[in-house]
Amino acid sequence: MSNFTPAWFKKGFFNESLFCDDFLSTHQLLYSNGAFFTPDGRMVDPMPLRCEIFEMMREYVGANLAKKVTNVVDVLKLAAQVEDFPPVTDRIALANGTLYLDGTFQEGKPEIVRNRLPVKYDPKAVQPVHWLQFLSDLLYPEDIPTVQEFIGYCLIPSNKGQRMMVIKGSGGEGKSQIGVVLSRLFGCNMKDGSIGKISENRFARADLEHTLLCVDDDMRMEALRQTNYVKSIVTAQGQMDLERKGKQSYQGWMYARLLAFSNGDLQALYDRSDGFYRRQLILTTKDKPLSRVDDPDIAEKMAAEVEGILLWAFEGLQRLVENGFQFTESERAKRNRELVKRDNNNVFDFLESEGYIRLKADACTSSKELYEVYKMWCEENSLNAIKARGFSDALIANQRRYNLESTNNVVNSSGRRVRGFVGIEALVQPDLTPSSWRV
């Protein structure tokens, strides 16, 4: 043992508080929202911290050393605690410095940050030819700028774009290779996850805290029973209520973006609101040529270009910011979203059908009669009818689109005033007699 005795160990007594003061005087460290943060970003694994504390203590503290290390870490959480540590959205912390949105770069790691990417900034990095060729083979040219902007969007802790992305194909195109490359770009700031799990598990959101990107590389085909958890992540702009199993809920920063690869659409079982679909950027892949021979090393080749991919993504981020966080969206992508929306809500096709109803400014029809006509249309077209309440809600939500007006002043066949719609006429007369009354 050396002759020097630290202030936190005097007369055989170990002072945890003084140890933490000494430790923080030589280490940039803070604790917020249940995690330690350093100039390298969030501390994902606390073991290196515990090992360093152990090495500092082992010469002076003998018995119960492991337990005392745990106690020190707990005291350190209190000593390094800050009330709030909000995300900073005008810069990207990288392996060799900080890149600001205006293009300026500052070398070094002078400050504690929430997220730091494991990629160096090199303004002279070569163009990522394998990456660009891969995207050209996978996607239609007009959709590549959307991917560029979305990946760039994920570089900063912001949800201003309020969009998630779904890349859809038939299988075998290689779209999930994008996730492999993004894992190299984002490192521990990206997580593999499941959109389905997020939608049904109230604890899943907390697992995405401090994360820039969540990738679902094989999205489940089942329609989501509830969409509020997914929508809250996509649109979060500030702190939200998070909950971990067995613990009290708390307010935490949420800025994880969602990216899914799938062979089908992201559908909702009950949510037919425009908002659920409006939040999706839906891109479709090209058909895989029968003569194409896949390169088994393509993921590694693209990952080796990560510094060039960073510059490419940063260009997309700058364009997105310049456009007020409005994504470039091709007519194909817009049509994809409309088709998905229609596929989940056949009320649109019913309203545009012939022989069942007619849009007519001076006509009016009760909600009940319209719903019976709609059920007839569904039965004759081998489609499943949604519930009456959902049908009326869909009409109300789209009444401006079809020049309808919801009212409670429609006179039905019995002479009673009931709810209905002005601007639509039923061309068929379904039997409104309750089935229990029929002979």
Indicate where each model-derived feature is located.
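N-terminal nucleic-acid engagement/recognition segments and initiation subdomains in replication
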Residues: 1-129, 137, 240, 266-267, ...
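Short, polar/flexible loop-turn hinges at active-site or ligand-entry regions and domain interfaces
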Residues: 7-9, 59-63, 138-143, 266-270, ...
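P-loop NTPase catalytic core of nucleic-acid-dependent motor ATPases
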Residues: 24-42, 47-49, 92-212, 281-284, ...
